UniProtKB/Swiss-Prot annotation:
GO terms for biological process: symbiont entry into host cell; viral penetration into host nucleus. Belongs to the influenza viruses nucleoprotein family. It comes from Influenza A virus (strain A/Mink/Sweden/1984 H10N4). A motif (Bipartite nuclear localization signal) lies at residues 198-216. It is found in: Virion; Host nucleus. This is Nucleoprotein. Residues 1-21 are annotated as: Disordered. Homomultimerizes to form the nucleocapsid. May bind host exportin-1/XPO1. Binds to viral genomic RNA. Protein-RNA contacts are mediated by a combination of electrostatic interactions between positively charged residues and the phosphate backbone and planar interactions between aromatic side chains and bases. It holds the Pfam family Flu_NP. Late in virus-infected cells, may be cleaved from a 56-kDa protein to a 53-kDa protein by a cellular caspase. This cleavage might be a marker for the onset of apoptosis in infected cells or have a specific function in virus host interaction.
Length: 498
């Protein structure tokens, strides 16, 4: 990307840091995940969890959610001002699963938020360590991306459910900062903007007064984030139009939906980071690994290496397939929900199947599910190779877009073609090229029409052996060119509901 110079790297976003060199970045990311690990160990001690219980991904998620809730200033304030029956605004908790007499038992725990904040700060050298909190949010977001489909949310905002590959990070909370904005897909940003515009249409005062001024600033900031994800001049120019609109209405919604569709071929740059569950960092810290001294990167070999020697368990429902549960967790760990299955399968070393063929439900277990029949199994999170996570979207030939398929947003920087059904996508662009954005629309459609499904993206990029930590010998896989690689193809997953 041309504007690379103005951007901070992910790690800088992740750690809130100013310009740092590679070593400093590795150290500060290491400090961040080390803090998460120390916090997790301390929580296991507080809760008197056995080694096996501490490695249970469901327990990890409960502990992560507790600390996120303890630091959710806005919600805490809201809860204190609007007391609801049976909810103590000063407490947080969730289900903890314990092994008793050969069975798994659920225990609901409750903690003072103040106490959780104290433990978190203590694990992070007395600091609030917001970067670590964002990291946990992104892990939860990646898990949601792999587990649920957002068809209903897409349809509600007037978008096409086939645009699901653009929806990375759609469940991230608003307070996830720059690191959160980097991992949001084009569709996610478009959906947030459309919701905002719709509120403005229905509520006259939304853009007015002191509050309206703040709203307007937020609107323009979101427009700029989305603009920064687009890689062609025409798409960016259209975003300028949307941003500068005097009072945003249906014309802007139309433009945004057009841009979202165009991103299926002229893909946006969306960051990918391997964010692992807290228990994985905890295990490493407990075994004496010093993250800050060794350094750590979210986009290189480190997460792969960490997963190679971490044993994590998951609760399994009676008719679920443990191998499928592992695939879900693996995809979440590597932020690969929207990656081409051919690439994921090659890296993982076992076939990654589309979600419609998975016999597994989500990782989290509802409070009304019967624990009597629950079993646990080891999650297989290891990989055969590792690859660098990308943020380019695979459009390496700048102005002329490369191919994109309905439903791929590349995660790994690995050479492949991005097959797509041009007819399906282009059918969505019927006629409407009048109005202020007509020349940009025409230009965007022209670029989309010239894209070829057989074009290679990430030329010369390959995967690496796990012993090759400096990425010296890329192995460039060859893929069956015609093969569709979409995870959401023929999908029957449940909807994500808050």
């Amino acid at each position: 990307m041309a504007s690379q110079g103005t951007k901070r790297s992910y790690e800088q976003m992740e750690t809130g840091g100013e310009r740092q060199n590679a070593t400093e970045i590795r150290a500060s990311v290491g400090r961040m995940v080390g803090g998460i690990g120390r916090f997790y160990i301390q929580m296991c001690t507080e809760l008197k969890l056995s080694d096996h219980e501490g490695r249970l991904i469901q327990n990890s998620i409960t502990i992560e959610r507790m600390v996120l809730s303890a630091f959710d200033e806005r919600r805490n304030k809201y809860l204190e001002e609007h007391p609801s029956a049976g909810k103590d605004p000063k407490k947080t908790g969730g289900p903890i699963y314990r092994r008793r007499d050969g069975k798994w038992m659920r225990e609901l725990i409750l903690y003072d938020k103040e106490e959780i904040r104290r433990i978190w700060r203590q694990a992070n050298n007395g600091e609030d360590a917001t970067a670590g909190l964002t990291h946990l949010m992104i892990w939860h977001s990646n898990l949601n991306d792999a587990t649920y489909q957002r068809t209903r949310a897409l349809v509600r905002t007037g978008m096409d459910p086939r645009m699901c590959s653009l929806m990375q990070g759609s469940t991230l909370p608003r307070r996830s900062g720059a690191a959160g904005a980097a991992v949001k897909g084009v569709g996610t940003m478009v959906m947030e903007l459309i919701r905002m515009i719709k509120r403005g249409i229905n509520d006259r005062n939304f853009w007015r007064g002191e509050n309206g001024r703040r709203t307007r600033i937020a609107y323009e900031r979101m427009c700029n984030i989305l603009k920064g994800k687009f890689q062609t001049a025409a798409q960016r120019a259209m975003m300028d139009q949307v941003r500068e609109s005097r009072n945003p209405g249906n014309a802007e919604i139309e433009d945004l939906i057009f841009l979202a569709r165009s991103a299926l071929i002229l893909r946006g740059s969306v960051a990918h980071k391997s964010c692992l569950p807290a228990c994985v960092y905890g295990l490493a810290v407990a075994s004496g690994y010093d993250f800050e001294r060794e350094g750590y990167s979210l986009v290189g070999i480190d997460p792969f290496r960490l997963l190679q020697n971490s044993q994590v368990f998951s609760l399994i429902r009676p008719n679920e397939n443990p191998a499928h549960k592992s695939q879900l967790a693996w995809m979440a760990c590597h932020s690969a929900a929207f990656e081409d299955l051919r690439v994921s399968s090659f890296i993982r070393g076992t076939r990654v199947v589309p979600r419609g063929q998975l016999s597994t439900r989500g990782v989290q277990i509802a409070s009304n599910e019967n624990m009597e029949t629950m079993d646990s199994s080891t999650l297989e999170l290891r990989s055969r190779y590792w690859a660098i996570r990308t943020r380019s979207g695979g459009n390496n030939n700048q102005q002329r877009a490369s191919a994109g398929q309905i439903s791929v947003q590349p995660t790994f920087s690995v050479q492949r073609n991005l097959p797509f059904e041009r007819a399906t996508i282009m059918a969505a662009f019927t006629g409407n090229t009048e109005g202020r954005t007509s020349d940009m629309r025409t230009e965007i459609i022209r670029m989309m029409e010239s894209a070829r499904p057989e074009d290679l993206s990430f030329q010369g990029r390959g995967v690496f052996e796990l012993s090759d930590e400096n990425a010296t010998n890329p192995i460039v896989p060859s893929f069956d060119m015609s093969n569709e690689g979409s995870y959401f193809f023929g999908d029957n997953a449940e909807e994500y509901d808050n």
